[in-house]
Amino acid sequence: MSATASTRRSGRRDDRPRGAARREALLEAVLKVVADVGADAVTHRRVAEVADLPLASTTYWFDSKEQLLTAALELAAARDIARLQEFAAEPPEDFIDPLDLAVAAILEPLDESLQASRGSLLATYLLLLEAARRPSLRGVAKEWTEAYLKLLGRLFKQAGSADPAADAELLLAAADGLLISQLAQGTGGDLGPGLRRLAGALVTG
């Protein structure tokens, strides 16, 4: 039976995603499951339920849980790396100081709604920590980190840093630590001023 005929008989449209969009919807579901209940809870069945898609769609695209987790981290990384590249190509006009830009590059995703950004952050950090015991995730984690360090290193160099690469690593590590602490404690707050002071202190020594 054709899809059109099926739709006519049922009297309703099936607006669920198909093709590549279906794959992306499944990966969005993986990220949601990770944020809600952790990476260990990711299964083909649970992902299909969260995505509101047939179970067969998960096994069509992904043979294993390892593939689900890796592809989900790849999706999150690709999106953020694209954001960083766009940020570097067209930095916000209201930022002139390179250290202000460095802090903004890290914290820009948090300008979205609080709930959405916290869920995204939690899924990201949980998957990055999974790389400690899942080697398949390490390549993505390294590529993602290097994208940040490349941009931050360039900005520290513009600011006159004596060791831009080391300063970039320290600023990124501090930001990660503070963000993880906020997630763990269920708190919020603007990390920008503190990170900016740290960036300035790194440059001035």
Where are these regions (language model features)?
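Hydrophobic alpha-helical connector segments
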Residues: A71, Q85-R118, A168-L171
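Helix-turn-helix
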Residues: A25, V33-A71
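Hydrophobic/aromatic-rich alpha-helical bundle segments in the mid-to-C-terminal region
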Residues: L137-R138, K142, E146, K157-G205
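Amphipathic alpha-helical packing segments from all-alpha helical-bundle domains
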Residues: I81-A82, Q115-Y125, A132-A159, A166-E169
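N-terminal intrinsically disordered/low-complexity leader segments
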Residues: M1-A21, K32
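Solvent-exposed, amphipathic alpha-helical segments
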Residues: A25, A29-V37, R83-E86, E90, ...
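Short, basic, alpha-helical segments at the C-terminal edge of helix-turn-helix-like DNA-binding modules
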Residues: E74-D80
